[in-house]
């Protein structure tokens, strides 16, 4: 690969990691669908209100089970949602009110575009007070928006806003409705600012035209509400990409000196039908409804509602859908995920292109649940690992770059929770991250040459002799770099050690699940550590637990690696090329919470089962000789970097990559 091509590849890393996620939408609309409430799943977004009516209505709100069993709610054959009232039972004016339903959204919502498609709304019936509205958690300070509301023989929708203090609107805004009050604040009492729509936008005339659509655009500067008859619904709405700039003149354009961003906070949506109460009962006599007690319009309303159940058969909502749109949120998650995949894929391609770097086929370990072999001995004895077959053929070093994840790769299952019950095998994970590759030049050990592969991994030249298994403890391998736990080497195919590296940010105390293994003996050697064990192709012995840093460091004379369980992994066919060992996660590429890009292939994640404690002291590293005389070197760990951008590859890291690769190419 030419130097210029490599530079372009490195440049693509920076671009893919630094570009801010954008809206992945090619349409002209700036609104993206976030939620759709309809059909069988309509009620998934609502909870039932069954308390006393806050507006003092003559009503009994049903809970969900009663509403379903009594037929007050149902999903129709056409897929619409029906929500009605009891229209069969004659009541006593002095008893409980008429059964009805009030549902409230489970969540609160912010500024956006909200569209409701109604096949039917409660008709123009005396005593009714239907409403579709929203309200903040702290009324009136967080505001209230009445999108659809009417009482008694209503035929024109009334849009009302309520908030605290003084909130004045302009009546000069272009709108089809008529503003009768411009003060939304509580200084005007409970009236609020009111815009009344044209006749036919509510009640019986609305239903006679096969219903229609209401749309509300709520921003920090204004609230606009449109009404569209069934035959006049904009094409952008029917196509699912609403464009408010093409909606035309709204029924209500609510804007003025009022700060909407401050006065109207997160809102929940409410759909209900009540009877009489403060408004419908208060104006009952002025609406052309029968008055039984001229001195008490509210009591006249209650009398009518109690004694005339059949009048309320048309007092129902039939909703085709409610859709929620917000600016640029519909695809943002997918965009971020796509960006992460792009960044990691480019990193893999760059590392694959490094010349003169060889890798040995590495088997992938699928865990947890391998067999645990331990000595059947009293509690004073320690777990003994079952040695693998020491006869291993030496394979020549292949000049094959570590491949990107392929369908052949078997993903390791997710590690169990730390809350697993006692007796379960806990699997800890360590992820090796893309690091600054300033250690590309070869390093020498006592018996053999170690070539730096990257990320702290090493490779011994094929001249190294086959390492035989050793079940006896070996002396620990201290380190001269930043605290890194030395792990026992394992050999695969050609006797090449498979090093295990650990990030400095390994959790301080990660307790493994107990599988009944005996505890270590007090007579155990002072610094126990299993030596390297060679294995047959297809069997990968698990690594010894990775020590985690401690504040005090390792006491002098103490072993940096505690006695661990031995875990035997079932045979698995070896991949034809170098296969990555991945951490237990849904995919082979991960973006960690510490803003590092995890790299697959030979930069491997390893799993282990043991208590983990790592020395925080700085000690010198020396190669460990095996029984056969081959040396297993511990390569200095490459520094892990955190870039300035929260999820980007650092510029300093890129400079290190370029310098390191240039040195390797010149060599």
Curated annotation (Swiss-Prot):
Residues 354-363, 379-394, 623-637 have a biased composition (Polar residues). Residues 1-24 form the signal peptide. GO terms for cellular component: plasma membrane; side of membrane. Glycans are attached at residue 63. It is found in: Cell membrane. Residues 395-427, 448-483, 574-622 have a biased composition (Low complexity). GO terms for molecular function: endo-1,3(4)-beta-glucanase activity. It is an enzyme of class 3 (hydrolase). Keywords: Carbohydrate metabolism, Cell membrane, Cellulose degradation, Glycoprotein, Glycosidase, GPI-anchor, Hydrolase, Lipoprotein, Membrane, Polysaccharide degradation, Signal. A lipid is attached at residue 644 (GPI-anchor amidated glycine). It is a lipid-anchor; GPI-anchor. The active site is at 144 (nucleophile), 149 (proton donor). Residues 25-288 form the GH16 domain. The keyword Secreted does not apply. Residues 645-667 form a propeptide. Its EC number is 3.2.1.6. Residues 354-427, 448-646 are annotated as: Disordered. GO terms for biological process: cellulose catabolic process. Belongs to the glycosyl hydrolase 16 family. Mixed-linked glucanase involved in the degradation of complex natural cellulosic substrates. This is Probable endo-1,3(4)-beta-glucanase AFLA_105200. It comes from Aspergillus flavus (strain ATCC 200026 / FGSC A1120 / IAM 13836 / NRRL 3357 / JCM 12722 / SRRC 167).
